[in-house]
Design a protein with these regions (language model features):
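Juxtamembrane interface at the cytosolic side of transmembrane helices
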Residues: 2-10, 202-231
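Extreme N-terminal signal-anchor transmembrane helix of membrane signaling/transducer proteins, especially
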Residues: 7-26
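N-terminal membrane-insertion alpha helix
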Residues: 20-38
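A hydrophobic membrane-anchoring alpha-helix module
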Residues: 185-188, 201, 205
Length: 231
């Protein structure tokens, strides 16, 4: 009876060791693969955004500029990180806008003229979160991306009130990580954020799952090998 109890305890210990080894290995496998897929998703996000903007290439644009409209050159080692001020005149009047340093540096366009162009184009045909997310998802599907994506589009109007729109599927939003954020427009009034969600079961490949199962089985085999050697 005592011998059977000792064997059971030893079996449980071997099983726990195997499970712990599988969990630790699985964690590092998951983190490694997640990092890889995040890089892929981030690069493809900008590709999707470019493709979405190309849909508006047929819009006729009439812009009038005067004076010095050139924005300061982005310096990523600038320790001051001071905001910049831009002036605009539209049908709503004249106004100076203060752009935070982070928004200025994360605008996808460096040219001030191109930024003004995007402001006008997206005023005429606003960015759609669903449309962008669909393009992003379709491009990611080509590389067999194992996660889920969500897009948020934030727009700050002339009176500096911000509104947010999300792509349809929000079931994973609370579990998702903010992967990439960028801005468009002369005053960086349009913010686009891409979210990703990864289930560990989907991220790990069949080979990874077999490896984790093998670790548990191997720990149990140690118990039976020991029993065999004793006998």
């Amino acid at each position: 009876m005592k011998k059977e109890r000792e064997n059971l305890e030893l079996l449980l210990i071997c099983m726990v060791i195997g499970i712990i080894a599988a969990c630790i290995t699985g964690y590092f496998l998951y983190e490694n693969k997640k990092e890889y897929w995040e890089v892929q998703a981030r690069d493809i996000f900008y590709e999707a955004l470019t493709e979405e903007m190309q849909k508006r290439s047929g819009i006729e644009v009439f812009l009038c500029t005067k004076g010095n409209n050139h924005l300061p050159v982005v310096d990523f080692v600038d320790k001051k990180k001071e905001p910049i001020t831009v002036f605009m005149e539209t049908e709503y009047g004249k106004k100076n806008f203060v752009i935070p340093y982070e928004k200025h540096t994360h605008n996808i366009i460096r040219s001030s003229d191109q930024r003004m162009l995007y402001t006008y184009v997206l005023y005429k045909d606003s960015l759609k979160a669903d449309s962008l997310n669909m393009i992003w998802s379709d491009l990611l599907a080509k590389v067999k991306f194992p996660g889920k994506t969500i897009v948020r589009v934030s727009v700050t109007d002339w009176w500096e009130h911000e509104t947010n729109a999300y792509s349809n599927d929000l079931s994973y939003l609370s579990k998702s990580d903010s992967l990439v954020s960028c801005y468009l427009g002369y005053r960086c009034e349009i913010g686009v954020t891409g979210f990703t969600y990864f289930s560990w079961w989907e991220v790990l490949t069949l080979k990874d799952k077999i490896l984790l199962g093998a670790l548990v089985v191997a720990s149990l085999l140690l118990f039976f090998v020991q029993e065999f050697m004793i006998r």
